[in-house]
Curated annotation (Swiss-Prot):
It comes from Fusarium vanettenii (strain ATCC MYA-4622 / CBS 123669 / FGSC 9596 / NRRL 45880 / 77-13-4). Its main location: cytoplasm. Its EC number is 3.1.3.77. Pathway: Amino-acid biosynthesis; L-methionine biosynthesis via salvage pathway; L-methionine from S-methyl-5-thio-alpha-D-ribose 1-phosphate: step 3/6; Amino-acid biosynthesis; L-methionine biosynthesis via salvage pathway; L-methionine from S-methyl-5-thio-alpha-D-ribose 1-phosphate: step 4/6. This is Enolase-phosphatase E1. GO terms for cellular component: cytoplasm; nucleus. Binds 1 Mg(2+) ion per subunit. Monomer. Mg(2+) binds at D14, E16, D192. One of its GO terms (biological process) is L-methionine salvage from methylthioadenosine.
Amino acid sequence: MTLNLAEYDVLVFDIEGTVCPISFVKDVLFPYALEALPKVLDQEWDSPEFAKYRDAFPEEYRNSRPDFEAHVRDLVKRDVKIAYLKSLQGYLWLQGYKSGDIVAPLFPDVDPFFNQAVKDGKKIIIYSSGSVPAQKLLFSHTNSEKSDMTPLIADYFDTTNAGPKTEVDSYRKIISSHPEHKDLGRWLFLSDNIHEVSAAVEAGIRSVPVIRDGNAPLPPDNSLTKLAISEFKHSEDA
């Protein structure tokens, strides 16, 4: 299945498993943050800059460096998507992106599709469980020709400013943030997670699941699975 850009005004993209491999997050970003954590805690535990991340954690962890570190490692191990962890991870990734140690490996169809969409006057929005600052870091340090993809992106949403990605109200918040686009039939949300796709559809917008190498299989008995795409490709015949 291909996409006809003429049918849409707003394109909302998930990140992990949609525009870049799940393995990048699981095998590169998460381990990098854990590796950087002890040094940051040693050097910055009492610094004003780090305090805003530390103090966002529950009280029982923010007063003890060992307890703090143990809690972070436990959350990552259990893949808990909670705002205060995501904010800390974004902070830990910052130096990795700046040094060039981290480069986001976007799928090869993402760069041309984003550019074509913007050229055609479409609005691109990112919605991920990763914090908005972490999203901006990722898209400003990619393997695409110009590296920085942020000029193509109109807005960013995460679990803090929108809400959990499997909840219908989260998509309604995103929609309400762009009242200039009242025709919900001209919105499209793309994600590898069928539960997120279902929530978006329930909110009134169009949505299709994305199949990428390394993703978990989509449930065969779900009607939305039949709509799945495996690449971002524009076709006027779609």
